Amino acid sequence: MASLACGLAIGCSNANYSRGPAVEDEVDPDALVPDVVVEKQSPAAALRVGFARKAYTPVLVDAWVDVNGNAKWDPGVDTFTDGNGNGVFDGYWLAGFSQGRPAQSVHDDIEAVATVIDDGTQRIAFVALDAIGFMNGEVEDVRKQLPASLGVTLLNVHSTHNHEAPDLQGLWGKDFGNTGIDPAHMAATKKAIVDAVTEAVGKLTAAEMRTLTVPQGALAEYVADTRSPEVFDPDVHVLEFRDAASKAPLGRVVNWSNHPEALWGSNLAITADYPGYVRRGIDESITYGSEKKMDGLGGVTVFLTGAIGGLLCPRGNLEVTDRFTQEKITTPNFEKARAIGYGVAASVIEASKGSNAAWSAQAGWNRRSRTFEVPATNQKLVIAAQVLKIIKRDFARHLGVPYITTELHLLELGDAKFLMMPGELYPEIANGGVTVPAGADYPKARKLDLPWRQMIPQGGTQFFVGLSNDAIGYIIPKTQWDELAPYTYGDTEPPYGETNSIGADTGLVLDEQLRKIVKLPVPDRGSEDPN
């Protein structure tokens, strides 16, 4: 959740460093750039898998004092120690919630956590960043930096959507006119991705895999849906790997849908939020002080955030119960992050240890990928990029409408089906429950009534991974789009979401692209008529 206090009100959707023509350039004005399609299926073969993690936590050079206690940098009120002697305050601006929130300390490392999965034909890498978002242009840049000798055929870079780490998009600088991106930190982030993938390739080991689905159960209290209709993406999905010879755990991918914002907007410490506790709990142990509550599984955990639009989050006043201490926690703090993270970790540990699911040493990647354009009708995005220049994203124009380029991937490996989505998907698109509420702006638009979980191949375990290879903001059903009065569900003001989306057609465009991937007919988009 990115606060409207960011001023530009385009939230988690809009940063990139150079892809395609600038918005001023009228290139092919009468037609979209053709989609780029990649389809490649490997035969089932022996698997090799490697895992690695690299911290990219910045060193805080300048210390500062929040004199008035408002969790924001106020020049002339707050004070700082000029650690590098350059005469200015050099802050690392925390992304999410509001601008002007520089880090005061480091609570725990932020990391690039990687797995590389090789079937002998295709070598596909996944890297998860403890970041709010990482733009498609940045992903393309890292792909170019990967040495060809690594043999990686596809690199996926995912952001957990962490709201307590330095800005990698540009929206959360010291004020509306300044980017929040520190160039050195951006470079360190990219290096961490490359280093993690390089190490994971070096650790490729003959492996066996299996998948698990962990029913949400008690985890339900850790997440709220803050916008009607109330639809969740509840379960935890796990892809496990073990050494084919020794049977020792190598690592796993864990996928769950909940915004990492347990600390909320007054926190000033860099942290991975609850996903850090998920990883440490599973990989090492669940420990409180000197007391170990549960042994971990070993190996390395890659945490991938799911369909979190709508908005699925541990909202500031949400009461959660720590299953190990039985403490009920309402205040946003590290105890809340720990309760959520260790709760998820415990559910995965128990499911893994109790599972009789068969392991498989052979599988083959079936990759179906599309790169395409999406209309960017949120004019604040264009202003932020082209006028204020606090973010960097390029556009093409077609018939006067700006477009961005993004990508969508359906990746199958045995029983595991990954849908790599470029933004924050509303869970009703994934699971069903899309509505046409009274007061919606486009009631005659095509209703997304075929849930994506039914659209992609059935059987096995589905991993819906948000903020993958881009961060284009909320992916909203057009029939629920609501910027204009009268507002839906009897609200007196517009709901949260639209100002953090690149446009009302985003959900329709992505639905069309997924239909093309799975060879389904693409229906008409319906009418723009509001009546």
Would you name each region that the model predicts?
Residues S13-H158, A165-A339, A345, S352-N531:
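Conserved beta-alpha junction segments in alpha/beta enzyme cores
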Residues M1-A9:
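Bacterial N-terminal signal peptides
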